[in-house]
């Protein structure tokens, strides 16, 4: 794993060194501290302010930090400890103008089991992450080739999680429709589709892209299930318009005050999302058999 943060500006390097100090001050059982996410990939956004749809918005990437411990803590205990580390880090800083720290934690045993079983979130951290602190007492596992039973179990686990998540969004969309909240309904329909497509991708590949674009996700899902493209054909102008509306809903339904979605739009979209649900269930369950 990489260890250098010299590509970052001095202030960022100082921040990360201080984060390490704050964690070690309150957590003697800490074995590793790993930077992951956009700062590890050097794709971070330091500060971006713009006017979108008449609303001033700003965005800053977080410091994503994985804290690895020698023992497995109860959730409320480790949350309390890392909350102390966070508070200590912000002392003397303007908390609302500083880069936010987001901690996750794993015991070394659980982390190594996840890497060994090729769980993509953790293998990505190992591949892209930067070791900020290492006690030297443990080593990270190597990912290995899974046997058929393990592949089947992991595919089924991913499918059950994402498919149920998609169903939750679809249920929320139905509540929104009944309440005549069509704009937020379109967002929940987008999220349902995103998770249905990811159900297919994960079931077939055990990997999920960091992606919200339905254009991209539908294309990837189609390589594993040609039938998935039947839910949103784009042969006519109206079919294209409905798909574009759903694609745009991820951002515009939340931030654009003037984004317009009608009852008729929702009534046309829901059967398409339900068809995608049924296709997803069929192709994924056949794959897992």
Each predicted region: which residue ranges?
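Metal-dependent nucleotidyltransferase catalytic core
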Residues: 2-26, 46, 52-115
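Flexible, active-site-proximal loop/turn residues at the rims of small-molecule/cofactor binding pockets
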Residues: 39, 72, 259
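Generic secondary-structure microfeatures
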Residues: 37-39, 69, 191, 196
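Short gly/ser-rich loop at a beta-strand->alpha-helix junction or flexible surface loop bordering the NTP-binding
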Residues: 31-45, 49-52
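Terminal alpha-helical segments
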Residues: 75-80, 95-97, 101-106, 112-289
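Positively charged, low-complexity intrinsically disordered regions
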Residues: 42, 56-57, 278
